[in-house]
Amino acid sequence: MVETGDSILDLQAIFGNANPVYIEIGSGKGEFISTYPRFHPEWNFLGFEVRGKRIRNCLKKLSPAVNSNVRLVERAVNASISQYIAPESIAGAFIQHPDPWPKKKHHRRRLIQQDLLNSLAGILVPDATIQVSTDHQEYANWIVEEFLTSPHFISIYEEVMQEEPNLDNHVVTWFEREQARMGYPPNYMLFRKI
């Protein structure tokens, strides 16, 4: 576990090396953060999750011998991320099935908002990518609009929403599996910092 405060995290000290650092925002039940980094031992991964129970589930799935390039942070990600992550220090980000907050009165709680995108643009290296997936069609439309109206990002794909994952070694998360089982196929999006 990585403790965050008001000071900038020393990522090299946290991981013990200077390898590129990727973040997962909302590690959920831990499928992605415990599996995908195994395919990329040359990268470091910092998983953020706000719920203590989910952090404990993630920790159960992580093995120090296998997941030596993974660290977890129990903290909500919002625009304040730029207060504890150094500018242009993150190689990329993964956001898997964030809470869609479907009721209109709750839309202000949605993760993907301009203030977060502005902060992410500040901490990402040039040309870094953000991979996003959601099974909620209206939220997918919202995400696309937020990214495409941001001055910091463009879609990698001409057709912004894809039906197939845009990652080698795609990890199917519990949320993706459950929603697909109920007839809600995921949309995959990939954006690049400009």
Language-model regions: role of each:
Residues 26-28:
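Class I SAM-dependent methyltransferase "Motif I" SAM/SAH-binding loop
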Residues 1-21, 31-38, 59-87:
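S-adenosyl-L-methionine
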Residues 112-126:
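A short glycine-rich, Lys/Arg-flanked "PGG" loop and its adjoining helix->strand segment in the class I
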Residues 56-61, 142:
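Short alpha-helix adjacent to the SAM-binding motif of class I
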Residues 126-134:
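Conserved beta-strand signature within the Rossmann-like core of class I S-adenosyl-L-methionine
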Residues 145, 150-194:
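Class I S-adenosyl-L-methionine
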Residues 51:
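Conserved SAM/SAH-binding beta-strand->alpha-helix loop
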